[in-house]
């Protein structure tokens, strides 16, 4: 007959008296030999937790006398305990028959009714019914002898259970539930693998961080007849809840029945599954092994309490959207490939796990969450400015610019799972960090991956996919020519480079730039058969840029031979010929001649965006003249009559001719083009500068309402809207900049973030210099501030600071070629203190544009002395811009911080750049590159 022994300050139990209501009292039974009781003698009695018996309605285990009742059901289960070859196999047999509840007996035999059925380990290969509880007293080793810090002589049971059982009476509510939970141990695990999360009072094992105390658990109880549930298979036991611990809040507290003591084992109805939200249940029955998972993975996943990280509403909405948009999400091949187990797992060759199971969200054995546990939902960090690599191929055009999630379940959605073979892509610049080659070779549909975290609006705009036409070479996709489709434009990324990274791709023919049309109209074509014959030895990589006459009809550009209809590029009427360098009608020809010779000062009554067509071309002469100038009409174009037809076409199509991406050297003279300006003779423009002219952004409007009186908030809001549009323009311009895409992606991000303010104020100075001769600040055609409006604004001192730039342009008489080269150098004028990842490529690119600036100076300055003086003046202006822009950064950051009080709106992408980079710049965490010492 076993006795109930008191422990610590508790009162001793009197035989024959009522049972002690203390929870956690030790039960002393006859010891039994076990594999985990190496140094435990027969006199040492294990301690186990007791079930509180002071309340009615609790589940009592079977009596310890005699054999099992005939109506009870015994279940046996084998599990593997051979973990990493360190331990031998062991079988655990436990009777888990459902015991019906009955009221407690009021006699001395009541003690027998509270004894639990303990697991009696047997030899391998044996399976027998469980003996009575009074005969099996082998204790459970919670953590097993595998703890390295435990001395081998001390039993693991005593070291682990003693701190769990030595609780003060005042903490019964917190410890009773944990002690009761230790009574119901997971079946299918060997004692050495029964890893239970430590409570707040238990010591942690080595290497495991401290975690909050687990929630109380309620143990699932079968029906009285002991029948098993038919749908109980699976690793997640269909939401059966458990509660571990004392005062549980929320659904955990509701799961405990009223009649159960605090921390006791309560009954939870099987149909009430609403309490099972994020927890894994423990069941008193055998759980079948989940398909596609090994026994070890199943047991470890089913019975370890996993604190799943809660997902916010945005992540849940993204997951729902991904499931809804997946067309193949019906358990077919799409679902099988998306949820395939890892190749390194023991069950890689088994059936895929169920869709509802998320094994990658669990903590690994070292209790640390995986870095890529939630690959589909993006980063939990604040939005960072990341630039993704642009997808290649025609299928990238179907991707939405604003989508950050893959539209369906694909093998790349979960980076832990095996990825399908990626398609071959054209070679790109080699990454400077190891392990990034696989990221750049990811398929177009896998834009969201663990190596490239999701980014912001700037990321989506910077390298969004463009419609791509097939390339000529081994990476060429199928042809995409369609009848009446015009022509296909190829991305700029396909252009060759003279750098070492592009030398390997010289065998594949390069692609073309998109036609840089004006006002949406294509440029004129040209005949290049003669020029192509002369470039056989000089430009072998660039021969596909030059089209023979036979290809003129297939080109989307116009040419005189294959022009289906001669259309005026100004008004759309039938063109009578090439007048002043542009294919126009007779009306626009006469209008342009009279307007330029008469020096009329036309003003638009609208917003400088009037429609100029055949019917309305006479409504607004200002917009008509502006369109003529934008199309390239110049009075000097009459000198074309002195040349033959081939040279005329070459000169007219200079902008439309694609230029090499690589920086040309001095020997590349054949690719130079002729340009003309009024009052000047023909001059040669270096090809790179000519390319910079062709990629210059169009006119950007601020959208300011000039009909209303100016207020501080309205002016600042309009300037912010203009800054957002100009930032987008800077991003697109940098994409087309030769040599910029050879830099590392992070370097491209950094350079844009550090220089966007300098580029904007430099463009403001150029527009003010060209349009109003530096007398006003020409922010946009619809936002021009004269001195009176500057004084009325709240940022008059800032306007005076910005006004210095156009005044310097007027003083130095800066040419357009010089301005374009200086603008690129501004982009490359500020780097981080630690340098860039592709520092070598950056220095080569910067040196090349410095040489281009010297060439631009040589177009106007003759002589070494004058050219050197001019170079000093222009570079000194670039150095002085650092201090000027710093004042703009400080004012912009202060306005951004007080934007709510000032009623000033900041657009999204501009806000991201200001919040992420301006504090670093103002704190001196950047390194300005100066031409001259101060």
UniProtKB/Swiss-Prot annotation:
InterPro entries reported for this sequence: NHR-like_dom_sf, Nucl_hrmn_rcpt_lig-bd, Nuclear_hormone_rcpt_NR3, Nuclear_hrmn_rcpt, Progest_rcpt, Znf_hrmn_rcpt, Znf_NHR/GATA
Any Gene Ontology CC annotation: cytoplasm
Region AF3, residue ranges: 1-164
PANTHER family for the chain: KNIRPS-RELATED PROTEIN-RELATED
Chain ranges for the short sequence motif LXXL motif 2 as given in the UniProt record: 115-119
Motif Nuclear localization signal mapped to chain: 183-187
Organism: Colobus guereza
Protein name listed in UniProt: Progesterone receptor
Coiled-coil boundaries: none
Annotated spans, AF1: 456-547
Positions that bind progesterone: 767
Region spans: Disordered: 1-49, 61-239, 331-375, 415-454
Subcellular localization: Nucleus; Cytoplasm
Lineage: Eukaryota, Metazoa, Chordata, Craniata, Vertebrata
Subunit structure: Interacts with SMARD1 and UNC45A. Interacts with CUEDC2; the interaction promotes ubiquitination, decreases sumoylation, and represses transcriptional activity. Interacts with PIAS3; the interaction promotes sumoylation of PR in a hormone-dependent manner, inhibits DNA-binding, and alters nuclear export. Interacts with SP1; the interaction requires ligand-induced phosphorylation on Ser-345 by ERK1/2-MAPK. Interacts with PRMT2. Interacts with NCOA2 and NCOA1. Interacts with KLF9. Interacts with GTF2B.
Zinc finger residue ranges, NR C4-type: 568-588, 604-628
Segments for region (AF2): 688-934
Record remark on domains: Composed of three domains: a modulating N-terminal domain, a DNA-binding domain and a C-terminal ligand-binding domain.
Keywords, in A-Z order: Cytoplasm, DNA-binding, Isopeptide bond, Lipid-binding, Lipoprotein, Metal-binding, Nucleus, Palmitate, Phosphoprotein, Receptor, Steroid-binding, Transcription, Transcription regulation, Ubl conjugation, Zinc, Zinc-finger
Disulfide bridges in this chain: none
Amino acid composition bias (Polar residues), ranges on this chain: 191-203
Function: The steroid hormones and their receptors are involved in the regulation of eukaryotic gene expression and affect cellular proliferation and differentiation in target tissues. Transcriptional activator of several progesteron-dependent promoters in a variety of cell types. Involved in activation of SRC-dependent MAPK signaling on hormone stimulation.
């Amino acid at each position: 007959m076993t006795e109930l022994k008191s422990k610590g300050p508790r009162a001793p139990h009197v035989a024959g008296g009522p049972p002690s209501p203390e929870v956690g009292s030790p039960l002393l039974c006859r010891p039994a030999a076990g594999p985990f009781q190496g140094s435990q003698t027969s006199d040492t009695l294990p301690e186990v937790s007791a079930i509180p018996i002071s309340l009615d309605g609790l589940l009592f285990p079977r009596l310890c006398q005699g054999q099992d009742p005939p109506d009870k059901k015994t279940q046996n289960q084998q599990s593997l305990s051979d973990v990493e070859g360190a331990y031998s196999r062991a079988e655990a047999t436990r009777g888990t028959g459902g015991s019906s509840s009955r009221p407690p007996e009021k006699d001395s035999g009541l003690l027998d009714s509270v004894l639990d059925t303990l697991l009696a380990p047997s030899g391998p290969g044996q399976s027998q019914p469980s003996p009575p509880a009074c005969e099996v007293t082998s204790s459970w080793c919670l953590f097993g002898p595998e703890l390295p810090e435990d001395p081998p002589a001390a039993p693991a049971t005593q070291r682990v259970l003693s701190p769990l059982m030595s609780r003060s009476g005042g903490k019964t509510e917190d410890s009773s539930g944990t002690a009761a939970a230790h009574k119901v141990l997971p079946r299918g695990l060997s004692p050495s693998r029964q890893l239970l999360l430590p409570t707040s009072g238990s010591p942690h094992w080595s290497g495991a961080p401290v975690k909050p105390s687990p929630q109380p658990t309620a143990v699932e109880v079968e029906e009285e007849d002991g029948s098993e549930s038919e749908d109980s298979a699976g690793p997640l036991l269909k939401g059966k809840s458990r509660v571990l611990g004392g005062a549980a809040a929320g659904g955990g507290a509701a799961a405990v029945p009223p009649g159960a003591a605090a921390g006791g084992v309560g009954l939870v109805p099987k149909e009430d599954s609403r309490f099972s939200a994020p927890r894994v249940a423990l069941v008193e029955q055998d759980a079948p092994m989940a398909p596609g998972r090994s026994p070890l993975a199943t047991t470890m996943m089913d019975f370890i309490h996993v604190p799943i990280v809660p997902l916010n509403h945005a992540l849940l909405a993204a997951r729902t959207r991904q499931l809804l948009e997946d067309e193949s999400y019906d358990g077919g091949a799409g679902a099988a490939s998306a949820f395939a187990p890892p190749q390194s797992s023991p069950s890689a060759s088994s059936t895929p796990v169920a869709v509802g199971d998320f094994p990658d969200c669990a903590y690994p054995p070292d209790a640390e969450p995986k870095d890529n546990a939630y690959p589909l939902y993006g980063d939990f960090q604040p939005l960072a400015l990341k630039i993704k690599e642009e997808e290649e191929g025609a299928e990238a055009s179907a991707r939405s610019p604003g989508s950050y999630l893959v539209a369906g379940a694909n093998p790349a959605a979960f980076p832990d799972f095996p990825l399908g073979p990626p398609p071959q892509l054209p070679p790109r610049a080699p990454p400077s960090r190891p392990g990034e080659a696989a990221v750049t070779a990811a398929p177009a549909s896998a834009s969201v991956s663990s190596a490239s975290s999701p980014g912001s609006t700037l990321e989506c705009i910077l390298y969004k996919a463009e419609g791509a036409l097939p390339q000529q070479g081994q990476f060429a996709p199928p042809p995409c020519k369609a009848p009446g489709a015009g022509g296909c434009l190829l991305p700029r990324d396909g252009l060759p480079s003279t750098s070492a990274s592009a030398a390997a791709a010289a065998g594949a023919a390069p692609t073309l730039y998109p036609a840089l049309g004006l006002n949406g109209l294509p440029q004129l074509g040209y005949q290049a058969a003669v020029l192509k014959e002369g470039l056989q030895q000089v430009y072998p990589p660039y021969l596909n840029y030059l089209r023979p006459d036979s290809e003129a009809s297939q080109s989307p550009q116009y040419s005189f031979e294959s022009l289906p209809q001669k259309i005026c590029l100004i008004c759309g009427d039938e063109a009578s010929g090439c007048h002043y360098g542009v294919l126009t009608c007779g009306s626009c020809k006469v209008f342009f001649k009279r307007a330029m010779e008469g020096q009329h000062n036309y003003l638009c009554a609208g917003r400088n965006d009037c429609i100029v067509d055949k019917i309305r071309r006479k409504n607004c002469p200002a917009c008509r003249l502006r369109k003529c100038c934008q199309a390239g009409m110049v009075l000097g174009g009459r000198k074309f009559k002195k040349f033959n037809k081939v040279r005329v076409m070459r000169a007219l199509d200079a902008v439309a001719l694609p230029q090499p991406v690589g920086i040309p050297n001095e020997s590349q003279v054949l690719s130079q083009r002729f340009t003309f300006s009024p009052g000047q003779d023909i001059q040669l423009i270096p090809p790179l500068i000519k390319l910079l002219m062709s990629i210059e952004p169009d006119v950007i409007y601020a959208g300011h309402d000039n009909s209303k009186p100016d207020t501080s908030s309205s002016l600042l809001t309009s300037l912010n809207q203009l800054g957002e549009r100009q930032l987008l323009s800077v991003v697109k311009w940098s994409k087309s900049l030769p040599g910029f895409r050879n830099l590392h992606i992070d370097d491209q991000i950094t350079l844009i973030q550090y220089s966007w303010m300098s580029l904007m104020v430099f463009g403001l100075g150029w527009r003010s210099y060209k349009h109003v001769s530096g007398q006003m600040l020409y922010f946009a055609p619809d936002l021009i501030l004269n001195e009176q409006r500057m004084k009325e604004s709240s940022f008059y001192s800032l306007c005076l600071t910005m006004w210095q730039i156009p005044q310097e342009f007027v003083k130095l008489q800066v040419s357009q070629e010089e301005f374009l080269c200086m603008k690129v150098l501004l982009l490359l004028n500020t780097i981080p203190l630690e340098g860039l990842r592709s520092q070598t490529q950056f220095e080569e690119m910067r040196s090349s544009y410095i040489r281009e600036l010297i060439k631009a100076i040589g177009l106007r300055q003759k002589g070494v002395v004058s050219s050197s003086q001019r170079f000093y003046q222009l570079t000194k202006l670039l150095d002085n811009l650092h201090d000027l822009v710093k004042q703009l950064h400080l004012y912009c950051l202060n306005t951004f911080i007080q934007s709510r009080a000032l009623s000033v709106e900041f657009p999204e992408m501009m806000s991201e750049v200001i919040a992420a980079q301006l504090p670093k710049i103002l704190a001196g965490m950047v390194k300005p590159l100066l031409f001259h010492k101060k």
